[in-house]
A protein has these predicted regions:
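Histidine-anchored nucleotide/phosphate-binding helix
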Residues: 137-152
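Short aromatic-glycine-enriched beta-strand elements
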Residues: 48-52
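Structural detector for short beta-strands of small beta-barrel domains
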Residues: 35-46
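Short, Lys/Arg- and Gly-enriched loop/turn segments at beta-strand edges
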Residues: 88-97, 135
Length: 369
């Protein structure tokens, strides 16, 4: 990493404002100030240790005293913490300040646990490479997690210099906009500097940079930081995929103001308790559902279904409804792992629909007979 974007080794008390310190955090920290503890923000986490920027500089801190049973409460990049004042290496994190927002995905395990990727985030920057075919369903998945986190999402289409002409770029932006209502979609070229100033002007506060490996996140981060801070690896021409360039989550200061959390490429983007986020991504379907004749309409074959009517008249693309159903089912399955009542209700619905299907088949056989 370049030293120009790393925290200063000895920032002043007021310089914590660069990292997002404000009156709200000061009020949260007041109960610790009397014990001589120091406020600081976690800029990097490594297996039980973390780097924390404080008024005294960047200190190495052990998280031994704040190891929770709940994986959602582990110390994460972006957290504000209270650390020991003693000058020793490492110091200890004594407490974690309540988070304002948190970006969470489900883990690949069957234990229904969430993995927190970044804390206290204002903007979720979703990087999507134009060097590969657009996967609108994956973009919608990222957006659901972003909205659920409480952050404002921004979709950044990277490697726009590889698109043959401006008309094609505009068409691709338009396609993504259909999957991202209420979200700004920008096409940028970090190599040529196109669109970087516009993006930088949007990113006040704390932003987290997300995307698959090969999406150009590290190159984009370097362009925003104005320095070669993040290492960049080559991408395979055959599929546009790359290796993990970033292996840890790092919090870095942007020259335009605010801070950026760069994350490793995400192969899996599982939903975690993201019902509200899914609803936000598919706000037009949620609005149509309010006009259905029945309040519990499943949008399958019910009479008076406004969603199906929109499908029939072409105002709602079938792909959008399919994606909406898929993400809702996934979110329900995850929720059912930990909610016995929901699990029983889902079984009841499945049995009822199975019985209805069998009855329909029997009736059909009777008519044919």
């Amino acid at each position: 990493m370049s030293s120009s974007s790393l925290p200063s080794s000895s920032p002043s008390k007021s310089s914590l404002a660069v990292y997002g310190w404000d009156g709200g955090w000061e009020a949260e920290f007041a109960r610790f100030a009397g014990h001589g503890l120091l406020p600081g923000r976690v800029v990097r986490v490594d297996r039980g240790l973390c780097d924390v920027v404080t008024a005294e500089g960047v200190v190495r801190a052990d998280t031994e005293f704040v190891v929770p049973r709940d994986p959602m409460k582990v110390v994460c990049t972006g957290d504000w913490v209270a650390v020991d004042p003693e000058e020793r290496d490492p110091r200890y994190v004594r407490s974690l300040l309540p988070r304002r927002t948190s970006f969470v995905r489900s883990t690949s395990s069957k234990r229904s646990e969430g993995q927190i990727l970044a804390a206290n985030v204002d903007h979720a920057v979703i990087a999507v490479s134009l060097a590969a075919d657009l996967d609108l369903g994956r973009i919608e998945r990222f957006l659901a997690l972003a909205w659920e986190s409480g952050a404002q999402p921004v979709v950044v289409l990277t490697k726009a210099d590889l698109v043959p002409d401006a008309a094609t770029t505009a068409h691709l932006v338009s396609d993504v906009e259909t999957a991202a209502p209420g979200v700004q979609v920008l096409a940028v070229s970090a190599e040529q500097g196109h669109g970087i100033d516009v993006l930088g002007a949007l990113l006040d506060g704390t932003s987290v940079l997300l995307g698959q490996s090969g999406a150009g996140k590290s190159t984009l981060a370097n362009a925003l930081l104005g320095a070669d801070v993040m290492h960049v690896h080559a991408v395979r021409d055959v599929d546009g995929k790359g290796r993990h360039t970033t292996t840890t989550r790092n919090l870095l200061v942007l020259p335009t103001g605010g801070v950026l959390i760069d994350t490793p490429g995400l192969r899996g983007v599982g939903l975690f308790d993201a019902e509200a986020g899914v609803g936000q991504v598919f706000s037009e379907i949620e609005a149509l559902a309010q006009e259905c004749r029945f309040h519990d309409c499943a949008h399958d074959a019910e009479p008076g279904c406004a969603v199906l009517a929109a499908l029939d008249d072409g105002t709602l693309p079938p792909r959008r409804l399919d994606s909406y159903r898929k993400l809702l089912r996934e979110n329900q399955r995850l929720a059912a792992r930990t909610d016995a009542r929901l699990r029983d209700e889902m079984r009841r619905v499945w049995k009822m629909r199975g019985a209805q299907g069998r009855a329909a088949m029997e009736a059909k056989r009777g008519r044919l007979g």
